[in-house]
């Protein structure tokens, strides 16, 4: 702790004595460096865990261990999450989007290291999920906590959060442009030109970390590419349509498989057993599903699909080219189940690497089938690589990220035109069937997803619990007019909730409605409150979104509405306080 304070003091001095813009630039270097180092630690952790498991008697060659290792990894992660993190981890990019929209870009401190540990164990033990989403969460947590530590406002804190995510993606793939585009497409709904510089700095620093420290075999590169020819364009368009449809299948299959685990929501170890065993059985049938899957992608890209059958049940039937093609197609279909078993079972990982795995297999399947049927001679390596962009674009709803990521990991822009064709075609196809990505659908259903629409973005950031006013004097349900007059005399409001002994709202009284009768003293003990109250024009629930609240105000024309939790009275929310809060948030989020 003293060591940390030694570095904190000069940063506090800089915070006080430099402009916010310059401090953000300095911060982007530090956030990028830290997130890049976190990515290095994660990749190294997975590598050494797998080396340890393979050490000795080459246990991974025995099929039984393919079942045991993923199960052990998931159980270990569930145990660690319950013991170290109170059972709360918050997986995937969706958790960061939720933090941006609902928590003012405040990410829990433990996420700076918890996702490195848990995803490293998951993937290291053979869990069929990617490391990219966990490193996005880790980088985002680093940026968010840095901004909170130095008292940055919401807008700048969100920018540093995105810087951490950009650095994480850049470090994992050694692809800084893709890191920047990912932050813009997925995390930042409203971006200004000035925000590009910190994002670029963080991404470059993160990529340099991985390039300097990591050995080349721990990074994924694609280099066996064919030459692009104009005659291939129709086939790339078809591949775009196919990857778009496969992306729809991937997303819907993931949601349905995940729904199977809902009965075990409160039974984490049983859920882990079910997910781990099902994953292990799938890996026994399809060994390439073990781990992230980049090894299988490399085999396809280098033209060695026969090696995928090694140790599989189909190896007994030889390496017939149709058999190999069918196996590749089956891998593309079952990968989503393996990934969902891993994550829903309690492991930690994301859909980034699995999307690339499926895309590579779809691209290879398509091109190999065309070649075998002698429809047209297609470069299988190129179609394998471009297929990754198609599925990534469709599943993540991030077409620009997909294009530039694949361009960067393939070492150039030879395939830029086919990448753009396939990515755009797949994205257009998916948007027709699924307007939201795999990570954002649940947030959208809850009304918690930020969009490029500034009005909706501000409304989604606003939360009803911060707007409830409790200075309205309640009146007892059994009260008389005399008691009501006493309440009016000590109140600054002209609206009075009527509640019973259980604090349940029974009605409301407006001062205008009782102004005449309140001066007739002879009726003070004869008239009851129940005779004077009326039903509110509408009620606001404590968990309503601000869009729902504003709709109720528009429909009723009211200026104040009661807020209830169940039937319990909490207070009132006023249209004027909403407008005041809205204006402040609009200034805070846009800087205007």
Features from the language model and the residues they span:
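Structural signal for short hydrophobic segments within the conserved structured cores
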Residues: 471-475, 531, 536-539
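Short aromatic/basic micro-patch
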Residues: 458-461, 508, 526, 572
